[in-house]
Amino acid sequence: MTVKKIAILYTDEDNEWSKPWGNFVDMAIKLLEQTRKLECIAEDVEYEVFHVQKNVFPQLSDLQKDEYLGIYITGSKYDSFDNEIEWIMKLRSFLNEMLTSKTEYPPVAGICFGHQVIAAALGSSVGRNPKGFEGGVVSLKLNSVGQKLFGAQELNLSEVHSDCVFDVPEGYQNWASSEKCQNQGFYRQNRVLTFQGHPEFNSDVAQKGLLKSQDKLTLEEFNRYERQCQELDNNGIQAARNIWRLFLQKI
């Protein structure tokens, strides 16, 4: 029996600030393994990492094979809308080809930068958030789409971002908003689920990410976000169960 694969597109270098918890791939695999067990998926899964920030991409023809269950795009410190860095421009073209083609490809989950670069690839406007940096553990208000997807009115997710997506790609639905970010995630049935937040970050990681970006906030904002890291339940694992449901084409 062929072991099914998840293709992880790693869009960053290893960061010193997150080192105690590993890099974004380490945290992604830990999250996917935790949620795989919660979803009672007994089959073994292989995680195949592609260092796209080093211009290492999967072949589109390979992704059409049945061995791939899904594609996971990590977060990154880079700008998804950059027009000078080769691999970012190549990634947008790669995603546009995959997501607009009539050919069937595995479902795609995008995290933070992954959320933004998917939107940019589909023609949405992405840039610096005029409302500023959003970080720590943030409460998201779910709309009717999000409530149906996640079975809740609100979700608390880790966030570390200064960029945002300004409009929803055609054929997709936004599922949540926050005080500073109107489009917190996109959904297309059986195809795409994105998170502006980081479901793979526990609250300690979120707090460390907040600390490294303290200079982007007023003291009042920083203190409020820091309190939220300590007081709000982090629903990252609960939310990420839907990544597996997407990969299995149950949502």
UniProtKB/Swiss-Prot annotation:
Keywords, ordered alphabetically: Cytoplasm, Glutamine amidotransferase, Transferase
Native organism: Saccharomyces cerevisiae (strain ATCC 204508 / S288c) (Baker's yeast)
Domain of life: Eukaryota
A GO term for molecular function: transferase activity
Keyword tRNA-binding: no
Annotated function: May have a role in copper and iron homeostasis.
Something else known: Present with 1510 molecules/cell in log phase SD medium.
Enzyme class of the recorded protein, top EC level: transferase
Keyword Cytoplasm listed: yes
Residues annotated as the enzyme's active site: C112, H198, E200
Compartments, as annotated in UniProt: Cytoplasm
Classification via PROSITE patterns: GATASE_TYPE_1
Higher taxonomy: Eukaryota, Fungi, Dikarya, Ascomycota, Saccharomycotina
Induction section of the entry: Induced upon copper deprivation.
PANTHER family on file: GLUTAMINE AMIDOTRANSFERASE YLR126C-RELATED
Glutamine amidotransferase type-1 domain location: 48-232
Membrane-crossing segments per the record: none
Pfam families per record: GATase
Annotated Gene Ontology cellular component terms: cytoplasm; cytosol; nuclear periphery; nucleus
GO biological process, any: intracellular monoatomic cation homeostasis
Protein name: Putative glutamine amidotransferase YLR126C
EC number: 2.4.2.-
